[in-house]
Regions:
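Glyoxalase I/VOC metalloenzyme domain signal
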Residues: 1-45, 52-131, 139-172
């Protein structure tokens, strides 16, 4: 990891984890305006980035802890990722793994923080509670957790928000 970079600082502070969860959107400016008008803190206003493969618009908001969400609009872009990124040819790629979709991304929280984070997704994104479990549902002698799965309207995006529950060891 390159020292002094945003992701390098995040990993130094938190260990392995995710700094930013990006969402593909039809209109990044509208997504940013809507979420910030509902109380999200802006990290970066919508900005145009471009190269010879086209253009994209990105905007970022703060969520829980040091985690952010970036809205990515790639309507006029023909590259594999975003303008300015170059394809890397891997010698030993995982060809044929068959992965086509991410089912969910988990946001683990400290004890007592799960509900305020879920309230944030409901208020800022208009999401709803898809499913929830408590320590009676997910526990062993040594560990337990509570979880609320938040989802968007069509339930294509799901984000379980977890927090630890009492056990002989902490697991989350």
């Amino acid at each position: 990891m390159i020292q002094g970079t945003q992701i390098g600082q995040h990993i130094d502070k938190h260990g392995d984890g995710i700094k930013d969860v990006s969402f593909s959107v039809d209109n990044a400016e509208k997504a940013w305006e809507e979420t910030t008008s509902r109380g999200a803190e802006s990290i970066s206003k919508p900005m145009l980035i471009e190269d010879d493969k086209g253009e994209a618009i990105i905007a970022t908001i703060k969520t829980y802890g040091d985690t952010t969400h970036t809205f990515v609009q790639r309507n006029n872009f023909n590259g594999n990722f975003l303008p300015g990124f170059e394809d890397i040819k891997l010698k030993n790629s995982a060809n044929g793994a068959g992965l086509v979709h991410i089912d969910h991304v988990v946001g683990n929280q400290p004890d007592g923080v799960m509900q305020p984070v879920c309230d944030f997704y409901e208020k800022v994104f208009g999401w709803h509670r898809f499913w929830s479990v408590d320590d009676k549902d997910v526990s062993t002698k040594y560990s337990a957790l509570r979880s609320i799965v938040m989802a968007n309207d069509n339930e294509q995006i799901k984000m379980p928000i977890n927090e630890p529950a009492k056990g002989l060891r902490k697991s989350q």
